[in-house]
Amino acid sequence: MASRRKSTTPCMVLASEQDPDLELISDLDEGPPVLTPVENTRAESISSDEEVHESVDSDNQQNKKVEGGYECKYCTFQTPDLNMFTFHVDSEHPNVVLNSSYVCVECNFLTKRYDALSEHNLKYHPGEENFKLTMVKRNNQTIFEQTINDLTFDGSFVKEENAEQAESTEVSSSGISISKTPIMKMMKNKVENKRIAVHHNSVEDVPEEKENEIKPDREETVENPSSSASESNTSTSIVNRIHPSTASTVVTPAAVLPGLAQVITAVSAQQNSNLIPKVLIPVNSIPTYNAALDNNPLLLNTYNKFPYPTMSEITVLSAQAKYTEEQIKIWFSAQRLKHGVSWTPEEVEEARRKQFNGTVHTVPQTITVIPTHISTGSNGLPSILQTCQIVGQPGLVLTQVAGTNTLPVTAPIALTVAGVPSQNNVQKSQVPAAQPTAETKPATAAVPTSQSVKHETALVNPDSFGIRAKKTKEQLAELKVSYLKNQFPHDSEIIRLMKITGLTKGEIKKWFSDTRYNQRNSKSNQCLHLNNDSSTTIIIDSSDETTESPTVGTVQPKQSWNPFPDFTPQKFKEKTAEQLRVLQASFLNNSVLTDEELNRLRAQTKLTRREIDAWFTEKKKSKALKEEKMEIDESNAGSSKEEAGETSPGDESGAPKSGSTGKICKKTPEQLHMLKSAFVRTQWPSPEEYDKLAKESGLARTDIVSWFGDTRYAWKNGNLKWYYYYQSANSSSMNGLSSLRKRGRGRPKGRGRGRPRGRPRGSKRINNWDRGPSLIKFKTGTAILKDYYLKHKFLNEQDLDELVNKSHMGYEQVREWFAERQRRSELGIELFEENEEEDEVIDDQEEDEEETDDSDTWEPPRHVKRKLSKSDD
């Protein structure tokens, strides 16, 4: 590249020093604030041995960055800071704007209005997408020349072959110098930035620097194809890429004439992770934008924390930063647009709630633009949704925003958003973006999506994006009324609720499931007693409600707990005596409320449908509660003995019950033995079996139902120590009757086959509940550890969890027990204490009783117990 000569004195090129015939306006680039000279071919007025020094221009500022700084040619202002110089020109010289014209080179069409050029393109170039706009300055007038270039099949652009002819023409064929790099090579290690051309009026003077020698680079024009012109009603401006030899700079152009399209592009993914992808915007085109705010650390820190400040935060920032609230709001909007941050109001509120636990105000409307050419390929990379926020003038033309260094890009994207879309188009194009995570640095919101985006409906389920919508009071009221009728709704009821509430089937089912769960947790802490008042909660397992008799299965007693803990109870206004009389008469006539009766009651009582339905539901509950209480009283009268305390540890391992004011139900060992034997036979007794157990044991039916529910819960969590012993007993005896054993089977050698001594010949087994409690011994935790130690001789950490579950001991207790055995082994003393073996000792008499056909008590043999303790199914 040719060498560059720099002046040592800060200066601005005067208008008289510029070529009045033809001037090229350099485009914008992004990077650190260092000017990048780029070689550019010129027209006839510039000789081949001269070099055009690319400098940063805007509509109302002319400057050149040299070693000393910047100097204004209209006054004596000088500064080494580019932002301060920009602010000075914007505020002191706002009227340096020239007229502009638009020329279609293909048709020789000339107009002063950009809208007229767009209409011309729609009429005479329908379907054409590859427009190129070159901005030149001729005779103190800015001219935009529109040409058309073609795109090759691989995504690269056709190289202009007639470069020599282009040099001889009055205007250079390309107003922007670019490299020959094809589009597929944009993700290389070199720092490559997308460049944009902004449609604005050029400045009066163009600073340039001439050299004696120059090595012109071969050029290739790259355009960014726009979307369909019929959809956007705007045309696309050129988007070029360039390989800068040095770092490039970001300079804000001057004010843009109203109605001109603004081209927004993004920087390609950088190797340096600190460089965030940004969108270049003509910030001076935004009203009251103050570039001096870009270096304010307070504002930058606030933006990095959260890109959407509230009005109170803006007020505080205005007082601290000494800028107006309007300037700060405009600055935040420009920063969000530059960084590609575009959240919906719901997303902003959700993000603020997660980070600050507060609320935010609404933000401007957002539209999601989907690059259709990016699709899921064989490498599994998902498609990308890009969002943009409409700020300032309509007619934004968007280009591709690169995500990561590994994202393959097959062609540049030019997506056009119509300035004023119709309502239907807006609804079809609005796709909620994913909830952006509040990070220290903002990033473009992007979510994976399928290759084909469905536009059939404008409403998208928030749960699919991780956003759980809050239900309204009306929806909750309908759900509560339905829940009081039936805690397990049928499909028809779910469909009805879907139509009324507008919720999905999954949301309704989840609400019912959560409510049942909360109800069970509330019930588990309530006390159950027999001689109770009407406010006592009767614990009924949820799984039994579908198999119980109607009296028990569908009864909803008056509850002291709130079945909807996350919402306040529904309240209705008090009813008059006349209304109560009409409702009572209707209920006595028919307790089932029909639609005709409901309409009649609404007209007669002037009550709402929900109030009438709730009154009937409460009435049914109170009626069923009275019947349940009468049934409990009858069961108590039939019980002949006072119930004592429970002694079995298995029952204690069930669901916990806390004390209450009433008398807690106690079960005798005989009753517990009956229930446990029945539980081993079936965990889900039928209503007839419940009645039989209630009659034989003398317990209330509700007590039995509650016990089975608690025991099932304990069994599910592995807390039933007695289950395997009863299961073994049940396998050898059906319903309490001994089964005949095969003679000699399982007897040790030397043991006789006859009846043991001292046993009567014809004794009969009596009912279990008429005799004493069974002498069933349980393996303690140390016994299980002893069996494991005798088998393995040491503790394997992989088996630690299993030993803890079996022995019901803590992790440290198990480790200490094995450490003690190891210590005893090293000292040569007895490994096990005598009291540890007592639980395992079963005398010969008990074993004989087990093997006889007519023994009164039953105990599983020792080998069965050891086998069960080792397998622990």
UniProtKB/Swiss-Prot annotation:
What does the UniProt entry say about where the protein is found?
A: Nucleus
Q: Where are the zinc fingers (C2H2-type)?
A: 70-93, 102-125
Keyword Mitochondrion included in the entry's annotation: no
The alphabetized list of GO BP terms reads: negative regulation of transcription by RNA polymerase II
One cellular component (GO) term of this entry:
nucleus
* Phosphothreonine found at: T36
Q: Which ranges are annotated Low complexity under compositional bias?
A: 223-236
- Identify the stretch(es) annotated as Required for dimerization: 272-432
Please tell me whether the keyword Transcription regulation is annotated for this protein: yes
Q: How does it associate, per the subunit comment?
A: Forms homodimers. Heterodimer (via HD1 domain) with ZHX2 (via HD1 domain). Also forms a heterodimer with ZHX3 which is a prerequisite for repressor activity. Interacts with ATF7IP and NFYA. Interacts (via homeobox domains) with DNMT3B (via PWWP domain).
* Stated family: Belongs to the ZHX family.
Q: What is the protein's given name?
A: Zinc fingers and homeoboxes protein 1
**Which lineage ranks, top first, belong to the organism behind this chain?**
Eukaryota, Metazoa, Chordata, Craniata, Vertebrata
Gene for this protein?
ZHX1
